[in-house]
């Protein structure tokens, strides 16, 4: 179920403060975050976030198509190693 429109998008407060601080300084540093639940705002476009996937930090560059989605969508948490091999011997 989607979030109610009247509530607005959820973003952790410290994340907005970090982005505004970087905008004032003019630097282009990576913003390290564990907040996979935060919605990407238009304010974030052009910044690179290091999003934690439970094991390591994945760099995510934010562009305009990502606005409105969550940071966690771009840092996969599971690694697919392929399906198990068939252990039965096939005879013809």
UniProtKB/Swiss-Prot annotation:
Keywords: Ribonucleoprotein, Ribosomal protein, RNA-binding, rRNA-binding. GO terms for cellular component: cytoplasm; small ribosomal subunit. The keyword Metal-binding does not apply. HAMAP family: Ribosomal_uS19. PANTHER family: RIBOSOMAL PROTEIN S19P FAMILY MEMBER, SMALL RIBOSOMAL SUBUNIT PROTEIN US19M. Belongs to the universal ribosomal protein uS19 family. This is Small ribosomal subunit protein uS19. It comes from Rickettsia typhi (strain ATCC VR-144 / Wilmington). The gene is rpsS.
